[in-house]
Curated annotation (Swiss-Prot):
Classification via NCBIfam families: PRK02227.1-1, PRK02227.1-3
Species annotation: Methanopyrus kandleri (strain AV19 / DSM 6324 / JCM 9639 / NBRC 100938)
Annotated Pfam families: 4HFCP_synth
Protein name: (5-formylfuran-3-yl)methyl phosphate synthase
GO molecular function: carbon-carbon lyase activity
Domain of life: Archaea
SUPFAM superfamilies found in the cross-reference section: Ribulose-phoshate binding barrel
Amino acid sequence: MRPRLLVSPVNRDEALEAVEGGAHIIDVKNPEEGSLGANFPWVIREIMEVVPEDREVSATVGDVPYKPGTVAQAVLGVAAVGVDYAKVGLYGTKTEEEALEVMRACSRAVREFGYDTRVVAAGYADAHRVGSLDPMSVPEVAAEAECDVAMVDTAVKDGKRLFDFLSEEEVGEFVDSAHEHGLEVALAGSLRHEDMPIVRDLGADIVGVRGAACERGDRNRGAIRSHLVRKLAEALA
């Protein structure tokens, strides 16, 4: 089965472009607040209103600190808006124990309040640049915390991509570990068009992009365009 393409718009117009281009998951984020920067609840709602029922919606809650209560409330907030996935960037957690505490709180918040939102634990391939936990530990943390998806992205958006920090073999090990724990796997990190067949063949369930779907490849100043999304979707086929 080919991976599902996740594209990250910042507003309604970009979301429509992503849908037209064939994105499977519309991922609401705010690049001005970081790699997994959180957008406003009303923006999430505006985007959800234009996404067809046969597509899914995810939302990031930020590159989060080691504050389990704060993060759990944020996850509960996006679950209440009605998204299919809540993505948590484990930015401020330096150890597996800290990450586990944060993600357990997130999973518990969603389940105890009766939502079926899937919880995504995201680590960073360039963790050494920001002092966060080893990304290779994320699948085990996600499984133990009863999350649904293990993800790896990049924290610093300076043009360097996932494979500048992890080899194809290491990414394959991440994918295999997550699958062995019964999790889905999402791969992201300034991925380019030419990376699509690689991440597909490594077994990713979800492939996340923003910059590659934007004009001039610029995730901050460029806008998502449907023809670029379509090329990425075709490259995953």
